[in-house]
Amino acid sequence: KLIRPSQGSVSLFHSTSKSEWTHALKRVGSVIETPVALNHLNARQNLRYYCKIHHVPNPDNVIDEILDTVGLGHTGKKKFRSFSLGMKQRLGIAIALIAKPDLLILDEPINGLDPVAIKEFRQMIKKLSEEQGMTVLISSHILSELYQVSTRFGIIDHGQIIREITKDEFEHLSEDYIVLKTNQLALASRILQDQLHQHFKVVNSDNEIHIFDKSHVIKAIVKELVKQEVEIDEIYYKRQDLENYFTQLVDSERR
């Protein structure tokens, strides 16, 4: 325990007391953002080292199984220091799997990964969940990737869980919204707010405005913007994604 709790309580596998937690924590594995391993050892040697720490019997059989699960069976004598970021992440997860956890906690596991490594990560997480029945808790700000591997979402703002929702519930609630692309974001925003009274979000990085109030159809919005001499690059309907849902929810909570 790093700090004493200020309030509230935590239950892990129905365990709440200090003595129960000691046993419950043995059922948990974790990788906190940056995987830790010995630079001068290869994947198999690193796993053998951690198997000794955990007093794992017949470690070679366990190591073969884990390397196959995380897709590192081909790395041979390659040292950890020479691994790509994706390979390091997979070895970190492999180390966490040595104790055969029922719960695996991953903090920002896809930060810095390339598209191929992200796809491999998704496949690995689904495999752990579907084939081994493992619960995987992922903390990440890359919501589009979370959506592809998760079945339940907890949305946190300023340290508080403000909403829990299943994937099925989200898909039932999600709606189309209007995407407006223009270089005149300030002028378009002012018109949407003052003349059309729309609920919207500005995405400066993409020169986009996302319009959520569908009381006005695209035709009416285009008509008013053109009248006010706003240059429209694109305007179209799009299905709401988890990122927009998150932003809307947080904005409404802060009002």
Each language-model region and where it sits:
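ABC transporter nucleotide-binding domains
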Residues: K1-I138, L143-D157, I161-R163
